[in-house]
From Swiss-Prot:
PROSITE patterns: K_BOX, MADS_BOX_1, MADS_BOX_2. Interacts with SOC1 and AGL21. This is Agamous-like MADS-box protein AGL19. GO terms for biological process: flower development; positive regulation of transcription by RNA polymerase II; regulation of timing of transition from vegetative to reproductive phase; vernalization response.
């Protein structure tokens, strides 16, 4: 008798559902065992019944097989991540290469090279770009010139101030020297007047017989 094909949908009758579960569970466990023995495969099978009852089979250890599975999933994820990163790096490199090529073309055009195939609009754009570049260059040049002029003016002011300070210092030293010399000279004159003795003489009679009389100095 030919068995009819079972329709793949949930069995509504609870008793029939439990009977079908028991039959299929035993068949699945048997197939898992046969696969592990015949093919030397590491097999782990975990089944929860509709009533949450656990059934399991493992050719070695459920925990060891699950740990191996998790490691493998992690390795696959890392490989996918590396592949994604490699693809992203290749895309970025390709994009940068295209940008560099475009910049090289633009640079040659700005130098007047490779413009034979340019249209009037492209040439006008190049001219406008050069004008803007020249304006920025001139503005920067004038800014640097102004800064250099201000720097030189500041140095000049500092030199003038230093020269003035040195001149005032020199004049002050000269005045002090003259005053010191005058003070020393006056002191010497006073000492000379105090120590100097004057001799006076009175002569009576002929020159050959005259005698002198000395008078003591007056205080």
């Amino acid at each position: 008798m030919v068995r009819g094909k079972t329709e793949m949908k949930r069995i509504e009758n609870a008793t029939s559902r439990q009977v079908t579960f028991s039959k299929r569970r035993n068949g699945l466990l048997k197939k898992a065992f046969e696969l592990s023995v015949l093919c030397d495969a590491e097999v782990a099978l975990v089944i929860f019944s509709p009533r949450s009852k656990l059934y399991e089979f493992s050719s070695s250890s459920i925990a060891a097989t699950i740990e191996r599975y998790q490691r493998r999933i992690k390795e696959i994820g890392n490989n996918h991540k590396r592949n994604d990163n490699s693809q992203q790096a290749r895309d970025e490199t390709s994009g940068l290469t295209k940008k560099i090529e475009q910049l090289e073309i633009s640079k040659r055009k700005l130098l007047g090279e490779g413009i034979d195939a340019c249209s009037i609009e492209e040439l006008q754009q190049l001219e406008n770009q050069l004008d803007r570049s020249l304006s920025r260059i001139r503005a920067k040049k004038y800014q640097l010139l102004r800064e250099e002029i201000e720097k030189l003016k500041a140095e000049e002011r500092n030199l003038v101030k230093e020269n003035k300070d040195l001149k005032e210092k020199w004049l002050g030293m000269g005045t002090a020297t003259i005053a010191s010399s005058q003070s020393t000279l006056s002191s010497s004159e006073v000492n000379i007047d105090d120590n100097m003795e004057v001799e006076t003489g009175l002569f009576i009679g002929p020159p050959e017989t005259r005698q002198s009389k000395k008078f003591p100095p007056q205080n």
